[in-house]
């Protein structure tokens, strides 16, 4: 988007050869990215795979939580009850000082494992974010609102301060990923790219959306990891924009029954998931694709660091 601000990208909506309402473009992404109600400088849809793979989720060890007598998280998801309070209950139930040394580290068992600014990622499940696109097509800060601050504090108190969350580099040097695959954490906070490395995992695993703020929250929400999210743009130096945009339209249109179908129906539905419930959750996750303008320029570095400070 810095390139767009510097005048290096074309506004796709200036050309009749592009139509952002076509079904092969990602509707939620288009809504989030359209500036002033008219300007689109990047686009993503069926032609992309990483928009789907970068969705953030919770991966859980089914065998682990069964051994600890936890309630079925799938059922909580489908009943609309997968909330941060219930996530905390599961995490606490699955945490144990295995060696009895009174110090929780990477030799023990944890309710969840993760790395990075977990608070920042988790709050998107609470139907909030740093920015929102308003009705006039202007991104506006929402992180200063009372609702956002209340939800951040709630996530911090409920999840981050649960004494059941293993944070790589803080509680130990073992990676959060190895903690999960070695059966030492019930949940792994990650994105769907993590599934590619779990095909040989001995324990059974499943997929959950980010937990909601409370049961009254209507939908499961979330975000994409923008470091993985790919999109297409047309540079201002392009000598034939209509040809380039027509090519993008055709390729994305044909990708619906080829690339996109194989990603969802072959790779995700059969090779990377192990149960019917995970496939149902993947449908839920597809609706959580979102773009936060906080990732643009210095907003991400400066604003996101605040959440890192809050997490201590």
Predicted regions: what is each one?
Residues 56-60, 64-65, 121-122, 232-233:
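Short glycine- and hydrophobic/aromatic-rich loop-to-beta-strand nucleating segment
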Residues 84, 88-91, 123-170:
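Glycine-centered hinge/linker elements that transmit conformational signals in sensory
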């Amino acid at each position: 988007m810095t390139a767009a601000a510097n005048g290096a990208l074309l506004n796709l909506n200036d050309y009749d050869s592009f139509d952002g309402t076509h079904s092969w473009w990602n509707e939620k992404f288009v809504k989030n990215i359209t500036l002033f109600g008219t300007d689109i400088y990047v686009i993503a849809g069926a032609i992309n795979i990483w928009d789907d793979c970068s969705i953030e989720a919770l991966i859980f060890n089914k065998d682990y939580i069964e051994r600890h007598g936890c309630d079925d998280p799938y059922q909580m998801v489908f009943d609309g009850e997968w909330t941060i309070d219930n996530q905390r209950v599961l995490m606490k139930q699955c945490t144990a000082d295995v060696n009895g040394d009174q110090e929780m580290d990477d030799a023990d068992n944890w309710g969840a494992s993760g790395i990075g600014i977990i608070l920042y990622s988790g709050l998107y499940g609470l139907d909030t974010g740093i920015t929102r696109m308003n009705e006039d097509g202007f991104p506006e800060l929402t992180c200063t609102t009372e609702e956002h601050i209340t939800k951040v504090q709630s996530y911090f108190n409920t999840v981050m301060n649960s004494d059941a969350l293993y944070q790589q580099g803080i509680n130990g040097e073992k990676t959060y990923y190895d903690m999960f695959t070695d059966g030492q954490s019930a949940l792994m906070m990650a994105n769907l790219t993590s599934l590619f490395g779990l095909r040989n995992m001995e324990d059974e695993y499943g997929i959950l959306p980010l937990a909601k703020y409370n049961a009254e929250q209507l939908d499961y929400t979330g975000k994409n990891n923008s470091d993985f999210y790919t999109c297409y743009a047309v540079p201002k130096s392009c000598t034939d924009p209509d040809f380039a945009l027509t090519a993008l339209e055709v390729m994305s249109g044909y990708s619906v029954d080829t690339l996109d179908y194989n990603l969802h129906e072959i790779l995700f539905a059969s090779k990377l998931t192990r149960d019917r419930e995970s496939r149902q959750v993947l449908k839920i996750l597809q609706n959580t694709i979102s773009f936060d303008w906080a990732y643009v320029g210095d907003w991400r570095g400066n604003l996101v660091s605040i959440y890192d400070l809050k997490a201590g």
